[in-house]
Amino acid sequence: MKSVLLVLSCAAILFQPAGAKPQSAEPVKHGGKIETKYDGFNYETVMRLRKMKVNCDGFKDKFKDACVSIEVALHCPGTQVNYVKHVSVQVVFENKDWVRLHSPDQRDFSIVTDTETLRLGRMSPVAKNQPGTWDTKVEVLEANIPYATFKKIAASQSVELQVGRDAVELREKNIAALKDLNSRVIVPTATSSN
């Protein structure tokens, strides 16, 4: 009787239902597209959150029908994805009719997170792919920031982007996309030597 009970208890432990085992986390549904590509010309691996809309309601108390989007890229030297050299952030301003371009003195970039304001310097305009064209409906500004600063932004509950006098707050799905992008960096585990 004892041996039957012992065999049954061992079998119960070995064949536990799948519900008792820890489940892997489901991917976050934020609507953003994240891609990883190796750039052979610059000898780096780029993990990029493709252009993602933040707001199409205009800026705070200004310019209705204006859309703001972001694109973020993590630049990792070589073919590895466990060290990020720097992060490039692009802020895209679009309008149906025209965009009031930011003059050089109105390109100061700062990000307000839960607890602090991060002043990240001056943004620069991104060159268009088509030479000889001038699109008055789109303005793309870019800034390079340290990875440590990006980690602070991705870990925040609320994030507001400020370019000059214009400010826009990221939505929950935008913050979730930044967290997802940051989670793709492989963090080396600490090994203990005995």
Label the model's feature ranges.
Residues 122-194:
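Internal interaction segment
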